[in-house]
Design a protein with these regions (language model features):
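Bilobed "Venus flytrap"/periplasmic-binding protein-like clamshell domains
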Residues: 1-22, 81-135, 140, 147, ...
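Conserved beta-strand segments of alpha/beta enzyme cores
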Residues: 4, 28-30, 66, 122-124, ...
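Short, glycine-/small- and polar/acidic-enriched structural segments
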Residues: 8-96, 102-107
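A local structural motif
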Residues: 23-32, 118-129, 263-269
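Hydrophobic residues within well-ordered alpha-helices
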Residues: 43-44, 135-136, 257
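Pocket-lining segment of extracytoplasmic ligand-binding domains
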Residues: 127-219
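Secondary-structure end/capping motifs
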Residues: 189-256
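Long, low-complexity C-terminal extensions of enzymes
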Residues: 247, 255-280
């Protein structure tokens, strides 16, 4: 039986998967697509063996998961696709209502930290499907992630727009890790060689993609409303590895999340036993 591997259906994950198509490695796995929250649930319920998941969900369920060492979706500052869009300046959102996209997990906590720690703002939160018009019919501001957020990054209209990657950097000076690649702990223990093989095909895919970003951008621009040049800039604004400063940024995020009651403690980052070729 092929291992079941999750795939976030956002452009920010395309560089990690594009090379799999070029290498025919997709023949060796069963790829299951979904939003971050959908994949979180599938992995935690044992219906996936390996998947990108929201970094906050790894912390909440670390007892049953281990991490691939070299894969994340992260940023050093601006991320472009995790946005707060508001009718009011961010400093004026105390007591206002904010709609949180229900496709998000890490970003919901990140926004709460930015508002409470960075701006001393305490709004009311509601959760909503990621439809901006409907969100703002019931709220004063909205949190969007992924490709729909990227569209509003390009076409900002009349909103106050805040990039949460940039806001995190301004508040902490640290890197931000939004998603990690997690492996079901039982699968990693019983299928260690297969786990290593899947790690290697993803590593090869990532290496290919980083050398062929213009090709990937041209490919994505065929069906997305973005120019190839914009997509190249977008991909370059993201980080996909998991070096030490990103691990430190993630652990700091966990500490702040614990401070506001979103975590019960700060877990260690426990990795699959794979000798990575990428330095940390």
């Amino acid at each position: 039986m092929k291992p079941k591997v999750g795939h976030i259906q956002f452009l920010n994950c395309l560089p990690l998967y594009y090379g799999l198509v070029k290498s025919c490695a997709l023949l060796d796995i069963e790829l299951i697509k979904g939003t971050p929250t959908e994949l979180n649930n599938l992995l935690l319920n044992g219906k996936l063996d390996i998947s990108p998941i929201s970094s906050i969900e790894y912390a909440r369920h670390h007892e049953s998961l281990v991490l691939f060492p070299d894969f994340t979706v992260s940023s050093d500052g601006e991320v472009k696709s995790i946005l707060l869009l508001s009718h009011f300046p961010i400093e004026e959102l105390s007591g206002k209502k904010i709609a949180l996209s229900n496709t998000s997990a890490t970003s919901q906590v990140l926004l709460k930290l930015v508002l409470s720690h960075g701006y001393k703002v305490e709004p009311e939160y509601i959760t909503s499907p990621p439809d901006l018009d409907k969100m703002l019919a019931n709220a004063d501001a909205a949190l969007l992630i992924g490709d729909i957020a990227l569209k509003y990054y390009v076409d900002r209209k009349d909103f106050y727009l805040y990039d949460l990657g940039l806001e995190w950097e301004k508040m902490t000076g640290k890197k931000m890790v939004y998603a990690v690649w997690a492996v079901n702990r039982t699968f990693a223990e019983k299928q260690n060689e297969l786990s290593k093989y899947i790690f290697e095909i993803f590593k090869n895919s990532m290496d290919y993609s980083m050398k062929h970003l213009p090709e990937i951008a041209e490919y994505a621009a065929r069906w997305e409303p973005f120019s190839p040049s914009f997509l190249i800039d977008y991909f370059k604004s993201l980080r996909f590895d998991f070096k030490k400063d990103y691990q430190e940024g993630l652990l700091y995020f966990y500490r702040l999340a614990a401070d506001i009651g979103e975590l019960t403690g700060v877990p260690e980052l426990e990795f699959v036993n794979i000798r990575s070729k990428v330095s940390t």
